[in-house]
Amino acid sequence: MRGFLKTFFASLLALIIFTVLGVFIIIGIGVSAASSTKDVAIGDKAVLVLDLSVPFAEQHVENPFGALSGDADDIPSLHEAVKLIEHAATDSKVSGIYIKMNMNTNGYAATEELRTALLKFRKSKKFVIAYGETVFQTAYYLASAAEHVYVQPKGLFEWGGLSVEYTFYKGLLDKLEIEPQIFYAGKFKSFTEPFRATAMTDANKLQTMVWLGDLYNQMLAKIADGRKLDTSQLRLLANTGAIQTPAD
């Protein structure tokens, strides 16, 4: 019994010590991150870089371990990114915007907000250019708001329309003998469909084609307007898969 108590209290003491050390380490990281924050001086003829590989979330995202890794940069929220573009339009030290348009990690809604902000920025008569090596469709859609778009000659250019894919779990659930309790009303209520069907129902196919087609039509119209092209020409290029490389 005495040996058990000795081991127990020794383990408890070790746990307390490690907990206290952990708290001090976290506090130290916070203090270090706070002390590393400083104002950045912007020189004349500065260029605002919009990197589409950065996901602009709805809320501001901070890296709590940035002080340890040496990378204390924070990712601005979507609202902050839009405000930065708006501020750059009136900042005399900012000459223009450079868009890195390889892979756009932002959703359609965020992409639309950024694109709208860029179109407003262009009214300031400052330049907006975009460049990419492997350019995907949603990235080009945003970049179509730029004055000039450049693609690496040996790179890749994707242009093939829009599509959606759904994963169905009913077959797996049946094999595991799991019966989910699902409640829905109406044939167009498709949120629970992956758990009660093995393929898309006709109703879901119809509604998906409607909203996806509407989204695609809007995208084509805005790209055509920005690049001075015809929507029927863009649709034909996508349907035939005629564009695979920048040379195409």
For every predicted segment, state its role.
Residues 2-231, 235-243:
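Small-residue-centered hinge/linker elements
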